[in-house]
Amino acid sequence: MAKGSAGDAPNTRDTSFKRPKIRESCTHCSSQKIRCTKERPACARCVNKGLLCQYNISRRTGTRRHSVRATPEPETTISNAPTSSVPPDSVKIDGKQSPAMSDFALLDGLETFNNSLWHQPITTDIQDIDMQYFDFFDPGGYQAEPEPINSFDIDSTLLCGTSTAGYLPELDAEASTRPSSSSSPPSQRSDGGRATTHGGGGCISTALQIFSELHVSSSACPIAAGAPSHNIREFDHVLDSNRAALEKLSSILDCPPCCHDQEVLTALFLAVQKALSWYSAALDVAGDGEPTSPSSRVKSPPAFLGSYALGAQAQTLARAYVVMAQLQQHFQPLLAKLQRKSSLSALGARSSSTTSLSSVSSLQSSTSGSAVIECQKRALQEALEDVVAKIEGIKRG
């Protein structure tokens, strides 16, 4: 009797309850799509960077938003669905993953596109760039610029009103969208990070060479008429060449004797403006099925999310996200450094004036060079505002 009672006793333990599965990678490593060392309670990367390391539940929470699909997907009964419905290697262009789309893979599929991600304005006045960023992949996250700038007496007060005083999203240096090359070419690197001569012409030769590589000659130019045309470039190639060019230009600014030379700074401003013009052209890529403009300089093959072909609007939005991310990661830090160096150069030219005839002539030359640099700053600011306007237009749809 006792045996029967023991066998028939109800099981008070709820077998339908399953303990939530904890993700193997921490939140920060997962959001940056990098390998986590998985130490508990905090991984080595978060400890080194002073970040709050958290291991979240892998189950998706909340109600999944409807996404527009050609065919409905069958319902799934998997209880431990991963947080991201899109594996990193599922985003590809032309049958393989495109490095340019890996920024887009940070987002949780098309349904996670939200207008709130675009509400971070961009600083367009290069005189007022303050290197502080908001991370729109980490809500509420705020970090200061890793490179200290308090040693320079530069006013970084943000403008109000029409200057859109704000920031691009932060991307960790370890989560570069492409295989990262050295920040400076071997021909420019030496002990102490000092740039050495390149091609016999030094830093100014390197800056002018970068300008030449990014420049597109006019079809009406009689000298360039017989040269082979490379005006049309792939979207991926534009991002690769711009990233490499900006890294080389940044290394020139680390050269003590050249970073204050006004001729070198003028060449740097010209090269930076050419790089920005390619970002602008990358935002003008015609979508699938749309006619290609004769003046278009950038083309992009169809993009896929897994086996799903993205529509024209989704591709345009994805390209804008990638351009926006690279502007923050490579362009804006270089622009801030260039602004500081040019301001210090102008300040040094004014403080070195004396009453001698030779110094007066030198001062006049420095003043003329400063005026040229100021013109370049205004032109660069107008070009940056144009890129921001294009991104805003894409955001509004």
Curated annotation (Swiss-Prot):
Classification via Gene3D superfamilies: Zn(2)-C6 fungal-type DNA-binding domain (4.10.240.10)
Biological process terms in GO annotation: aflatoxin biosynthetic process
InterPro entries noted in UniProt: AflR, OAF3, Zn2-C6_fun-type_DNA-bd_sf, Zn2Cys6_DnaBD
Alphabetical UniProt keywords: DNA-binding, Metal-binding, Nucleus, Transcription, Transcription regulation, Zinc
Feature: compositional bias, Polar residues: 74-87
Record-linked SUPFAM superfamilies: Zn2/Cys6 DNA-binding domain
Name used for this protein in its record: Cercosporin biosynthesis regulatory protein CTB8
Taxonomy of the source species: Eukaryota, Fungi, Dikarya, Ascomycota, Pezizomycotina
Gene: CTB8
